[in-house]
Design a protein with these regions (language model features):
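Periplasmic-binding protein-like
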Residues: 153-160, 242-282, 299-316
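Ligand-binding clefts/hinges and TM-proximal coupling segments of bilobed small-molecule sensing domains
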Residues: 37-53, 187-202, 282-316
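Extracytoplasmic small-molecule ligand-binding "clamshell" domains
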Residues: 27-135
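Beta->alpha turn/N-cap motifs
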Residues: 72-78, 113-118, 127-139, 161-162, ...
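Ligand-binding cleft/hinge of the Venus flytrap
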Residues: 84-86, 99-106, 188-211, 241-245
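Short helices/loops that flank or line small-molecule/ion binding pockets
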Residues: 101-105, 113-114, 118-131, 145, ...
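Flexible hinge/capping segments at coil-to-helix
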Residues: 162-180
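A ligand-binding cleft/hinge motif common to bilobed small-molecule-binding domains
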Residues: 119, 136-143, 191-195, 200, ...
């Protein structure tokens, strides 16, 4: 573990309000233990056929497997996004459930394929996979090769010990003097460095950033009081908090801060499939099945109200 007092670090000012959040946080999360059903037999949430989406599938379109929507999902050790069920072979999680909704809407069977992160770009480009649904962030570089339909916000979360007196971390003043665990070289570290600069300029004490090599050590530091909070990807922290009840969320920031970062279904560029996928997503958003999936996996705060095709991506 390495500790750095960020008063010694110079960080260029960003031309945005340092206290402005891009995500509307519903407030501190309730402390409750959730028992997730990780059985392979658990029924996925389903959606009705969406005739409008089906009609948008290009005439003669060749799916990777006839009659099936073949989706690559990577990182099956990343709950609640993707993990293996209790049979050690079935992919479950919010990503597979989202894929099921799209497959149902398009009148297709779902075929989930476990893929490495390095494999999916070639797999999608070659037609091995119809799409990848694996926490892929829209970037301008990726938009040159792929089409996107958004389905979640990229969200970072502040989590504290469940009994902590800290109720909210929403802006730079809220981190003043706190000890916060963060990953080195990450966008969340960039957020904290910028907020520390704002605090120093306002005469407030900066936060002390702490770096741990593994999550278990980080959680122990929070529970023992050596750290006040963790700041990282919301999904994994939300899952841990729900399982143990030992931590709770007190604030969120968009993962692309100070820009907007979106998570999207990814397809080969220009093959025409992204339009029916977008229509399918909008249908399940309006129909409520999408919300059911997010609630099942504790990801309500990452919800979107409208899917977008190829929105502005993070810069190259």
């Amino acid at each position: 573990m390495m500790l750095i007092n960020t008063t010694r670090i110079t960080f260029l000012a960003l031309a945005v309000s340092l206290g402005q959040l891009a995500v509307a946080d519903p407030g501190p999360a309730d402390v409750r233990v959730v028992k997730f059903d990780l059985s392979a037999e658990r029924e996925r949430i389903h959606a009705p056929r969406n005739e409008a989406a089906i009609a948008q599938i290009p005439a003669g379109f060749r799916f990777a497997q006839p009659g099936k929507f073949t989706v690559a999902v990577s990182g099956v050790s990343s709950p609640p996004l993707a993990l293996l069920a209790n049979d050690d072979k079935t992919t479950i999680g919010s990503e597979a459930d989202t894929a099921q909704l799209i497959a149902d809407s398009l009148g297709l069977q779902l075929n989930v394929v476990q893929s490495s992160w390095e494999d999916w770009p070639l797999g999608v480009s070659s037609g091995k996979y119809d799409a990848v649904i694996s926490n892929v962030t829209v970037t301008e570089a990726r938009k040159k090769r792929f089409d996107f339909a958004t389905y979640r916000q990229d969200v970072l979360g502040f989590y504290v010990k469940s009994s902590s007196p800290i109720q909210a971390i929403n802006a730079a003043p809220d981190i003043a003097g706190l000890k916060i665990i963060v990953g080195s070289g990450t966008n969340q570290e960039k957020v904290l460095l910028a907020w520390n600069q704002a605090n120093e300029q306002a005469g407030r004490k900066p936060a002390l950033l702490q770096y741990y090599d593994d999550n278990a050590s980080a959680q122990l530091a929070v529970q023992s009081g050596r750290s006040d909070a963790t700041f990282g990807p919301n999904a994994t922290s939300a899952y841990s908090a729900a399982l143990t009840g030992g931590t709770r969320r007190v604030g969120v920031v968009n993962g692309g801060w100070p820009l907007q970062a979106d998570i999207a279904v990814t397809t080969r560029k220009g093959n025409g499939l992204i339009t029916p996928i977008h229509t399918a997503l909008q249908g399940v958003i309006e129909g409520g099945q999408y919300t059911q999936v997010l609630q099942r996996w504790g990801l309500d705060v990452e919800r979107i109200d409208r899917s977008q095709i190829n929105p502005p991506g993070l810069p190259d």
